[in-house]
From Swiss-Prot:
Name assigned to this protein: Small ribosomal subunit protein bS21
Family recorded in the similarity comment: Belongs to the bacterial ribosomal protein bS21 family.
HAMAP family (alphabetical): Ribosomal_bS21
GO cellular component terms given for this protein: ribonucleoprotein complex; ribosome
Taxonomic placement: Bacteria, Pseudomonadati, Pseudomonadota, Betaproteobacteria, Burkholderiales
InterPro entries reported for this sequence: Ribosomal_bS21 (IPR001911), Ribosomal_bS21_sf (IPR038380)
Keywords, alphabetical: Ribonucleoprotein, Ribosomal protein
Length: 70
């Protein structure tokens, strides 16, 4: 569980921002969103495979030389 200690005379907004940052770093929100609904193992594999293919093509596209613009 993520906890933060309030510093003396620390505004609530600053503490809330610090809390959100720690939650984001731990990846808790993404994990909670993933577990919100049950996902079949086949659907999970299919989603992960599609993400891997997308990353692969994105990496290839970034390594290609740009087309000549004339």
């Amino acid at each position: 569980m993520t906890t933060i200690r309030l510093k003396e005379n620390e505004p609530f907004e600053v503490a809330m921002r610090r809390f959100k940052r720690t939650i984001e770093k731990t990846g808790l929100l993404t994990d909670l969103r993933a577990r919100e609904f049950y996902e079949k193992p086949t659907a999970e594999r299919k989603r992960k495979l599609a993400a891997a293919v997308k990353r692969h093509y994105k990496r290839i596209r970034s390594q290609q030389l740009p087309k000549k613009l004339y």
